[in-house]
Each structure stands twice: as C-alpha cells, then as structure tokens.
Amino acid sequence: MIVIPAIDLKNGQCVRLRQGLMEDTTVFSDSPVEMAEQWVKQGARRVHLVDLNGAFEGRPVNVSSVTEVVSAFPDLPVQIGGGIRNMQIANAYIEAGIDYLIIGTMAVTNPEFVSELCREFPSKVIVGLDANDGLVATQGWTQQTDLNVVNLSKKFEQYGVSSIVYTDIARDGMMQGVNIEATVDLAKQTSIPIIASGGISNMEDIFGLLVEAHHGIMGAIIGRAIYEGTLDFKQAQQFCDAN
C-alpha cells in the first residue's frame, strides 16, 4: 500500500479545506513545488494534486502550478483532479506529463466520458467517488445524489479504470479517522483497486487500512494530518513497506 500526499491548490497556494468548503481554508504553503519536494524527500512515490478552483468552476484554474510540479519532478507519478470535464483538458494534462487523471463529477453525470478517456488513455484514468453515508456527491461536494457508491463503482469495471479514489465526505479534513468499514466494503465489492481518502489522521488509521489492504486497497491519500503533524509521512510509508 502506498501513502500518497495530497497537495490541494487554490489560487496557486497549497491549502486544505474542511469537508470541501471553499470558505473554510487553511493555507500551508505558497509554493506547490516546494511542498512536493518535501514529500519526495520523505519517500513519496506518487502525489495527489487537486485543482480546487477547477473543481468548483468546472475548468482547470491552477494549471501553471500543476505543470511546475510535473516539470520539477519528471520521475514522480502525479495524479490530478478538479475540473477535468472534457477531452481537450484531459489531453492537455497528459501532454504536460500528468500520469493519472481523476474524474469526479463527470464520472457521475456522464459515465461515457470515462469510457472514452479509458480508450484514449489506457491505465491513466482514475475515478473519484465522494460519498456521504454511501451516497455519491458531485460538483465539489455541493450536490448530493441518490446514487449508491458501490453500484456506481461496478459500472466502471468494464471501462478499464485504473483505480477509484474513495472519499468519505463526512470525515474529510476533520481529522476524525478514516471510515475503514465503508472503504473495505467498497473494495470487497469491486474489482477496481481502491485508494482511500478522507479523515486519515494517524498511524492507527494507516494500520487499519493496511490490515485490510488485501481486499484491494492500494493506497491512502493523506492531507491535513501530514501538514498539521499528527502523522509522519515517512514513517507511514516505511511502515507500509515493512508490512
């Protein structure tokens, strides 16, 4: 299981939101490249970038910050989400050197877009499913649907999606611990590898996920915990490697 540091971008800065609320923002750095360098030095094998402005506006906004990170670390796999709503945007990111495209809202509202992307960019497409009590939310979490996250994930198995980033909205940015039960339940019911996200706050959460990783949990995205110091990133990755 790999530990993936999250770098959330808002107006060119590295920030964290609480429960996806743009008005509840904490700024951690003015330099995404320096932040990425910090995690690379500690052994990061992939970074998770989110264009928060893009997620809310439906188009890429922090493109320059994203491309700076990719250029600075050409050997570092990068996954990007937020505002990827058409093939033109997806193609631009792939050409810029992005390794994985995370499709959130469009995966829910237009699943055929995911199918098209998988055909165009095999093994480079990740679906981001954000759920509240097992029901999917979209549009930067502002729109709640009545779609069951497990049922929706099964739809993507036939497309060749490389993984699913599963975020429990109620836990995200709240440092309350990851929803292991819901994450494992999803992993058991789909053949697509799961990347856990939302609420991971300490080594206990990492251990809890690692114990269940054999069900298909391939990674864990960590945000606020590594910025506020409740989780040591290097220690977490070394622990996963040793077990």
Curated annotation (Swiss-Prot):
Which Gene3D superfamilies does the record cross-reference, listed alphabetically?
Answer: Aldolase class I
- Kindly indicate whether the keyword Nucleotidyltransferase belongs to this entry: no
One Pfam family this chain carries?
His_biosynth
Name where it's found.
Answer: Cytoplasm
What protein is this chain from?
1-(5-phosphoribosyl)-5-[(5-phosphoribosylamino)methylideneamino] imidazole-4-carboxamide isomerase
Molecular function (GO) terms listed? 1-(5-phosphoribosyl)-5-[(5-phosphoribosylamino)methylideneamino]imidazole-4-carboxamide isomerase activity
Family that this chain belongs to: Belongs to the HisA/HisF family.
Pathway(s): Amino-acid biosynthesis; L-histidine biosynthesis; L-histidine from 5-phospho-alpha-D-ribose 1-diphosphate: step 4/9
Output the Gene Ontology cellular-component terms: cytoplasm
Enzyme class (EC, first level): isomerase
Q: Which UniProt keywords apply?
A: Amino-acid biosynthesis, Cytoplasm, Histidine biosynthesis, Isomerase
Q: Which gene encodes it?
A: hisA
